[in-house]
Amino acid sequence: MNRDIYTQIETVGVLEKRVEKAGTFELKAAAMALAKAQRKLSVLLAKGMAELEDRLKIAELRTK
């Protein structure tokens, strides 16, 4: 999961640079690709947080 998150962060960074450099005709496609990458990153981060919360709850139950 962590590797996927880091890979997606790198992808978002690359796409941000692409949007910055895009000309008028390329801008829409570049912006859409960036939006999709950001959405995927958000999903990965949410899943990662949920997994972390589950682990924390399990650890708390074991220590009681």
Swiss-Prot record:
Keyword annotations from UniProtKB, A to Z: Transcription, Transcription regulation
Statement: the UniProt record of this protein carries the keyword Transcription: yes
Function per UniProt: Transcription factor that regulates expression of phage structural components with protein P14.
Record-given protein name: Transcription factor P13
UniProt organism field: Pseudoalteromonas phage PM2
